[in-house]
Amino acid sequence: GSPRQCAETCFIGKCYTEELGCTCTAFLCMKN
């Protein structure tokens, strides 16, 4: 159902794993 977390938190609105196809959603990074 829900997208998986890519990282525990976002850093200044960006994901640590952003280049792996993740997006910052609220305070979590979610898989696109």
UniProtKB/Swiss-Prot annotation:
Which keywords fit this entry according to its UniProt record? Disulfide bond, Knottin, Plant defense
Disulfide topology: C6-C22, C10-C24, C15-C29
The record's annotation in SUPFAM superfamilies points to: Cyclotides (SSF57038)
The UniProt entry, under InterPro entries, shows: Cyclotide, Cyclotide_moebius_CS, Cyclotide_sf
| Cyclopeptide (Gly-Asn) cross-link, chain position(s) | G1-N32
The PTM entry states:
This is a cyclic peptide.
On the tree of life, the source organism's domain of life is: Eukaryota
Q: List this protein's GO terms for biological process.
A: defense response
What single Pfam family name could you report for this chain, choosing any that match?
A: Cyclotide
What's the entry's take on its domains?
Answer: The presence of a 'disulfide through disulfide knot' structurally defines this protein as a knottin.
- Briefly, what is this protein's role? Probably participates in a plant defense mechanism.
Q: Which family does it belong to?
A: Belongs to the cyclotide family. Moebius subfamily.
Q: What is the name of this protein?
A: Cyclotide Hyfl-C
Organism for this UniProt entry: Hybanthus floribundus (Greenviolet)
